Every structure is written in C-alpha cells, then in structure tokens.
Amino acid sequence: MKSSKNDTFVYRTWFKTLVVYFVMFVMSAVVPITAMFPNLGYPCYFNALVDYGALNLTNYNLAHHLTPTLYLEPPEMFVYITLVFIADCVAFIYYACGEVALIKARKKVSGLTDLSAWVSAVGSPTVLFLAILKLWSIQVFIQVLSYKHVFLSAFVYFLHFLASVLHACACVTRFSPVWVVKAQDNSIPQDTFLWWVVFYLKPIVTNLYLGCLALETLVFSLSVFLALGNSFYFMVGDMVLGAVNLFLVLPIFWYILTEVWLASFLRHNFGFYCGMFIASIILILPLVRYEAVFVSAKLHTTVAINVAIIPILCSVAMLIRICRIFKSMRQGTDYVPVSETVELELESEPRPRPSRTPSPGRNRRRSSTSSSSSRSTRRQRPVSTQALISSVLPMTTDSEEEIFP
C-alpha cells in the first residue's frame, strides 16, 4: 500500500533535514579539533579560559580584566567536549541506521499514516532541528571562548542549554500524548530492522543525550556566574558559592519533571543520573586542587557541603526511579482492547421482561366502546412487542444459537 501525500511530504522533509544534520555534525567535529592546535585561526586555546593560579576568593572583580572564578580547567573541559562528541557520534550512527531502516520498512506500509508515524518514532524533523541547533551553538561557544569573550559565551551557552533541554524532552516524549506514542510504536512491524532501531538503539541514544544534559547543566551554571562575576562588583567567593548552588537547584527541577512527565514515556531513563555523578566529580576537583585558597577564604566547608549534597540528591532521585519501575512491573496495568468474544457474550445475555399483573382493585365493567378498543389494543400488542424485540435484540442465526444456547 502506498503512503499518503502528507506522509511522503513529511518523509522528504525529514530526509532533507537529516542531510543538514550530517553536515553540521561534520562541522561540529572539525571545530573543536582545529581549535586545539595553534596557527589555525584561533587566537587562544579555548580550554584554558581562566588562570587558577591567580584565584583569590576574597577579592572583587577588576575592571577591564578577566577575573578568575570557578570554571572548568583544560582537563575537565576536554572531558566534557569528548563525552559530548561521543554522544553525537552514537546519534549519527543511530540516524544513519534509522534512514536505512525506513527505506526497508517502506515496503511494508499497510496504512496511509504509517510512514509519518515511523518517522516520528525515529526522530521527527523537530527533533533533528533541535539537534542541529545544538551542534551549531556548541561551535559558536568554542569560537567565542577562543576569543575570551565570557559574556557572549555565557549567552551563547544559554541558547545551547535551552536547545539541549528541549531536544532531550523531544527525544523522550516526541511532544505528543502517551497514547499517540504508543500507537506510533504499535504501527512498527515486529522483527524488522526498524523495530530494532526504535526499541533498542534509540533508548541508548536518549540516555546519552540525558547524560550530556547533566554535564551541560554544570557548564551553564559556571558560565552564568563567570559572566556575572566579571560584569558586576561582586566578591569572587560569592560567585563560586552561587555557581555551586545553581548547579544544586537546577537538577531538582529535572528530577521532578522526570517523575511527573518523562517517566510515562521512558521508564529506564538513567542517563541524567549518571551524568550528574560525573559532573559532581568534575565540580569537586577544583575544591581539592585549590583547597588552601578555599580554606583561606573560609568557604571550604560551605562549598564542600553543598557539593556533597548534589550526588546525595541524585542518589535519592535514582532510587525513587528504580522503586517506581519495580512497582509498575508488579502492577502490570497495561490495557488491551476488549475481545470480540466478550462483546458477543454480553449481547447474548437474556434481558428480563417486566411482568404485567392486573391490579386487584381494577373495575371489570367497561362500556362497549372501551371493550372494543381494548380488544383492538390486545390484537396490536403482540405485533408491537415483536417489533420492539426485533429492533432492540440482535438477530440470531442457527450458528449463534448453537454457540449461545
């Protein structure tokens, strides 16, 4: 069966967007690599943004000078860029497999809207557009960092973080109700390559994106307070404490969003929790390296406690997610349509008829006109009753009488 014109248009749009995504992926892979080597057009090494040798938490920011605050050092920035690149590589393989799977599955289209449902299951054009926006914004972020523009880099990374949040939600929910997602998944032919891509490879890619979102939450928190610390007359220690507290609060909203909304679509979404553990390790490294600086500013205990709360909250949220998974497995509240045999049994049940007994005090003497009218009604009553029964009850055949005696 051929797909509808609407589905064909959706598939062509998705394919063109996928080509743009592949081109943007190549560019996003080239930019970080070339930015690490000198004499290739980048003025500075983007990983080394601040000099922690001059870190002083009791000083205020200096005008016309980059004041060092809490940020990622070159090893941590390299780990972050590498993990994001690995996730993008896996997503590149996933979309390539998805295109091949859709080409093979088009031969098994059985409905007018099957093709658009399969495209949405793999990744709608909206999801691809958000992925392209992510790849573009991370390139701009690296280029801006190489020029040491911390204010512009914070704004660009805010756009990147917003695109990452929307992209993660789109990958999990497809921005559709649960029943629409279930209907799209049920339309996929079983034991096919498309089935393997959607139900096995896509959850892996989605969890990788969620893990990268946790790392991006850390970089976003540090970027915001790096820009604030170099824009206003604030103490450096306050900016460090503010960055840690922002990274402590933002994941709580995601934990709530996961249990309220995202868990209905993807139960095994542990990628964000794993990313939070990695981000906590990255955040605690400056506290260990520059312990003397934090101790001299009397912020070591406060920052250490706040940083320690982050993995504790993550562990609690992860434990809640595991408990809810086991609870849903025990309940087994998957609803299925009512079978046709149950409907036939309900229709074949005999219906009780009301008994018609004359009242004891009724007057038996009637006039001739009333008696004649009553005789006519008695003659017409069986006909009307038969018509009523035939109009309400289903017509039974010999085979049905044998099944339902």
From Swiss-Prot:
One of its GO terms (cellular component) is membrane. Pfam families: Herpes_glycop. The keyword Membrane applies. Keywords: Disulfide bond, Glycoprotein, Host endosome, Host Golgi apparatus, Host membrane, Host nucleus, Membrane, Transmembrane, Transmembrane helix, Viral envelope protein, Virion. The keyword Membrane applies. Residues 346-405 are annotated as: Disordered. It is a multi-pass membrane protein. Residues 39-76, 143-149, 216-245, 289-299 are virion surface. It comes from the Viruses. The chain crosses the membrane at residues 18-38, 77-97, 122-142, 150-170, 193-215, 246-266, 268-288, 300-320. It is found in: Virion membrane; Host Golgi apparatus, Host trans-Golgi network; Host endosome membrane; Host nucleus inner membrane. Residues 386-397 have a biased composition (Polar residues). Residues 1-17, 98-121, 171-192, 267, 321-405 are intravirion. Envelope glycoprotein important for virion assembly and egress. Plays a role in the correct incorporation of gH-gL into virion membrane. Directs the glycoprotein N (gN) to the host trans-Golgi network. Interacts (via N-terminus) with gN (via N-terminus). The gM-gN heterodimer forms the gCII complex. Belongs to the herpesviridae glycoprotein M family. This is Envelope glycoprotein M. It comes from Epstein-Barr virus (strain AG876) (HHV-4). The lineage of its organism: Viruses, Duplodnaviria, Heunggongvirae, Peploviricota, Herviviricetes.
